[in-house]
Amino acid sequence: PDGSIASVIDKGDGIAYANIDLSWSRKKQVLDEKVFNDRRPEMYLNLPTDPYLWNPLDFFGLYGLDPLPKGKESLVTAVQMNSSNDIKKNLKKIFEYLNKAKDSGSELVVFPELALTGHLNKNKSAISNNDSEILELADYANKNDLYICCGFAEKYNKEYYNSSVLVGPEGIIGIYRKIHLNKSDKSWAAEGDEWKYFDTKIGRVGLMIGYDAIFPES
């Protein structure tokens, strides 16, 4: 529950041993976050459909309502980078990573949470989804036939969100706003209220951000 690795077997057969403190599990915390308080049950209404028991191609193609796009094998790059509060410097660094990923043959490049705007002073650095920095990412994606997913602090309708944008050759494809907020997020951001996935020419792409991944319901 504290995020530490208790034991590892990374290859071959074996038995993993570790001493565990059961009191940690009784705290109902993960990485010092009270996860049970941060659940969003109203967002999990689709879970009883049990789609995980189906072959995805059969489930999503049922009655032709929401068929999956034709899939393909693609090279995806996940970037790890440190961001500052200087958006221009962050954007320059992002383009440097994009150039490397493009040259390696990547078709989708994923940047971290808040990569574009930084982790400090989110309200002051927040941008709208049609500001020049987002448009520059979309223009790069269009010119290089590339899909880009990038986190940023978003200002929308007088609210602030921890968001991620997906851009591609088509332009700005969509925005996902983080649904599960941790303590840091709650100090500045509003909760998102919709899961987002997007059909692209490389397949269906669903978005989550950081703390979302702690919750199996996501």
Where are the language model's segments positioned?
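Active-site catalytic loop in hydrolytic enzyme cores
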Residues: 1, 31-34, 127, 155-218
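CN hydrolase (nitrilase-like) catalytic-core segments centered on the catalytic cysteine
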Residues: 1-16, 130-149, 213-218
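C-terminal beta-strand edge segments of enzyme domains
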Residues: 1-72, 197
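Alpha-helical scaffolding within the catalytic cores
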Residues: 57-64, 133, 193-194, 213-216
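Short beta-strand segments enriched in small/hydrophobic residues
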Residues: 67-84, 88
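Active-site metal-binding loops of divalent metal-dependent hydrolases
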Residues: 81, 114, 212-213
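Cys-nucleophile CN-hydrolase/nitrilase-fold catalytic domain and related Cys-dependent amidase chemistry
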Residues: 87, 96-177, 184
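Short, acidic/polar
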Residues: 89-100, 213-218
